[in-house]
Amino acid sequence: MKPSIHSLAHQTMQEWVLEQGEKKFRADQIWEWLYRKRVQSFEEMTNLSKDLIAKLNDQFVVNPLKQRIVQESADGTVKYLFELPDGMLIETVLMCQHYGLSVCVTTQVGCNIGCTFCASGLIKKQRDLNNGEIVAQIMLVQKYFDERGQDERVSHIVVMGIGEPFDNYNNVLNFFRTINDDKGMAIGARHITVSTSGLAHKIRDFADEGVQVNLAVSLHAPNNELRSSIMKINRAFPIEKLFAAIEYYIETTNRGVTFEYIMLNEVNDGVEQALELTELLKNIKKLSYVNLIPYNPVSEHDQYSRSPKERVLAFYDTLKKKGVNCVVRQEHGTDIDAACGQLRSNTMKRDRQKAVSAVNP
């Protein structure tokens, strides 16, 4: 399979055109066609020679993803199911926010973190996405608006889709550099957020990178016993090790951290847990922010249910009274397969059922 042209950083593109016997400025032209004019084929790059277009076609593809399903919500949320060149499926979500268009990208096919409440982990990790496959998700969402003649542009990115981004560290970093490049989509680093389930050593590495991308940590519980019961990653990186890495990140970057906390009815949503959480955050309270997330039920995880509004409000009020910055996340796409991984999982089930029916009519 030929790689996506989006896999090449700008400098790598310059090196490639020089290897082809071309002038270095050709790299700028190619990038302008890809990221500013957003063409879908090399033939549309009309200021390139036929010989260079042939070389591009011989070595790369523009778009490695095939659109399988698009679900549009009444609130403007759009969920995409894309097929990779090897036939595997991934999800991408567009959310219309008051501050702009935000896209949630996937970084792996499946997930090995194994959170007991999450649809993403229903299918184990099969492979990492490469940089080009992650970039292509942004480009295809942008194409959705371009084709409708809507003068809107993707302005924010959250790396919170299927997979653990820091388990695909190098590809995710290269994605940041490509999408942030002034000659490309030029999406500001501070408009990008990456979420990790808590790979402590990678949080330290990320602190040392010096990038301005925002960090979010999927916490979901304030103590080791509870967190280990719902997130097996906590057995490898218990809260003490995780928070040592978070404090290192804050000290190194002087940047805040968002903590994601999914509200599971009578599991982690009591006032007692809220008080534990305030204690856990006491040393970093000024540079921490808690995002309380209403739970999207997953049929395979029917041991969990959504916290009632009164329990969410009591938890929220407890945090606020203790001086913790927090918010209840606005929901998007509740009338479609909203939970991360749900559309992919449901589609794979239907595909399997069709295959069985074809064999046993």
UniProtKB/Swiss-Prot annotation:
Disulfide bonds join 104-340. One of its GO terms (molecular function) is rRNA binding. The keyword tRNA-binding does not apply. Its cofactor is [4Fe-4S] cluster. The active site is at 91 (proton acceptor), 340 (s-methylcysteine intermediate). S-adenosyl-L-methionine binds at residues 163-164, 195, 218-220, 296. It is found in: Cytoplasm. Keywords: 4Fe-4S, Cytoplasm, Disulfide bond, Iron, Iron-sulfur, Metal-binding, Methyltransferase, rRNA processing, S-adenosyl-L-methionine, Transferase, tRNA processing. It holds the Pfam family RlmN_N. Coiled coil: none annotated. Gene3D superfamilies: 1.10.150.530, Aldolase class I (3.20.20.70). Binds 1 [4Fe-4S] cluster. The cluster is coordinated with 3 cysteines and an exchangeable S-adenosyl-L-methionine. One of its GO terms (cellular component) is cytoplasm. Its EC number is 2.1.1.192. Reaction proceeds by a ping-pong mechanism involving intermediate methylation of a conserved cysteine residue. Belongs to the radical SAM superfamily. RlmN family. This is Probable dual-specificity RNA methyltransferase RlmN. The lineage of its organism: Bacteria, Bacillati, Bacillota, Bacilli, Lactobacillales. The gene is rlmN.
